[in-house]
């Protein structure tokens, strides 16, 4: 049996008031004891440690391993007494040079990281990437946040900008323009306020939540509809310390997705007007495939009505249902041609709003009261 081990066991069993200390500096180990009930002051303990290891001329830091395996510092009388009282039964002390300790080696789980590093040195396999020690943030503060996600519509976004008394400006410019609204009477152009430019390095650009051509709808809960550009500017300046802006993003792909349904992109408007997303048109474009226009199982165009429409005269040799295929193929070509041109979405809506009796060659009186049901 080792003599030092036998001596330490004797010290533990016969002197309960003594705490055995095992200090480590580099590859050197030293053992000594302290009085559990009267450990003394930290300055005396520091002098004892540096004298024991003969490092009086070095600037070192002292840490200890607690019962959970974390390496905690000893730098005042309070945590020194805590370290001595928590020793069960051995107090393990680690001594480091101050430049090594400032790299962030102290803290929770530091001993586990140190053991993994030693194991990696013994491993003969492929060398892993070196672990990067990230220190604690010195100036950590929020810059922006998205609020009221459950209250605003899916196509809108409510952003809070935090300035925290800094001199950095908000970092965006606004302009007036025309926005397109979908009303029961059709599409109408109304005045609107838009973000025209972002200042590089500003607060708004650093958030990543605002972009050019985003339409401003509210400023701190006040709607901007009916207000001039100067009035909206004054509202933003007055609330610049805690600005809450409700916008309609020009790019809907980066918006919050709810219920497993992705939002399409309206794209930045080319003529200075706000883009809009119509519910029926994107659904038709997503579900339509050119191969379905030539299917023999289902009719491409289905007309539902209470009256039986008069069947137009067929040419000799034409099979039954050829008119529906021709009309369906013509409609598919029109959809592809309109999508290839600029502003294809608006042309598609205008073509779908046209009277279907002209495009489908239906006789008058062959449609029910609420109009035909066209299914692609």
UniProtKB/Swiss-Prot annotation:
> Start and end of every Pseudo-CRIB domain?
134-151
Stored PROSITE patterns:
PB1, PDZ
**Principal subcellular localisation of the protein:** cytoplasm
Q: Where is the composition biased (Basic and acidic residues)?
A: 367-376
Q: Which residues form the PDZ domain?
A: 158-251
- What ranges does the record give for the region Disordered, renumbered to this chain? 356-376
Cellular location of this protein? Cytoplasm; Cell membrane; Cell junction, Tight junction
What's a single GO CC term here?
tight junction
Q: Which UniProt keywords apply?
A: Cell cycle, Cell division, Cell junction, Cell membrane, Cytoplasm, Membrane, Tight junction
Please give the positions of the paired cysteines in each disulfide bond: none
PB1 domain residues are 18-98
Tissue specificity is: Widely expressed, with a higher expression in fetal and adult kidney.
Q: Does the keyword Cytoplasm apply?
A: yes
Q: Which Pfam families match?
A: PB1, PDZ
GO BP terms: namely:
cell division; centrosome cycle; establishment or maintenance of cell polarity; establishment or maintenance of epithelial cell apical/basal polarity; regulation of cellular localization
Q: Does the keyword Cytoplasm apply?
A: yes
Report the InterPro entries cross-referenced here. PAR6_homolog (IPR051741), PB1-like (IPR053793), PB1_dom (IPR000270), PB1_Par6 (IPR034868), PDZ (IPR001478), PDZ_sf (IPR036034)
Instruction: Give me the ranges of the annotated region Interaction with PARD3 and CDC42.
Output: 127-254
Q: What does this protein do?
A: Adapter protein involved in asymmetrical cell division and cell polarization processes. May play a role in the formation of epithelial tight junctions. The PARD6-PARD3 complex links GTP-bound Rho small GTPases to atypical protein kinase C proteins.
Q: What does the subunit section of this Swiss-Prot or TrEMBL entry state? A: Interacts with PARD3. Interacts with GTP-bound forms of CDC42, RHOQ/TC10 and RAC1. Interacts with the N-terminal part of PRKCI and PRKCZ.
Q: Hey, which family's this protein in?
A: Belongs to the PAR6 family.
Regarding domains, what does the record say?
The pseudo-CRIB domain together with the PDZ domain is required for the interaction with Rho small GTPases.
Q: What is this protein's record name?
A: Partitioning defective 6 homolog gamma
Tell me what organism the protein belongs to: Homo sapiens (Human)
- What gene, per UniProt, encodes this protein? PARD6G
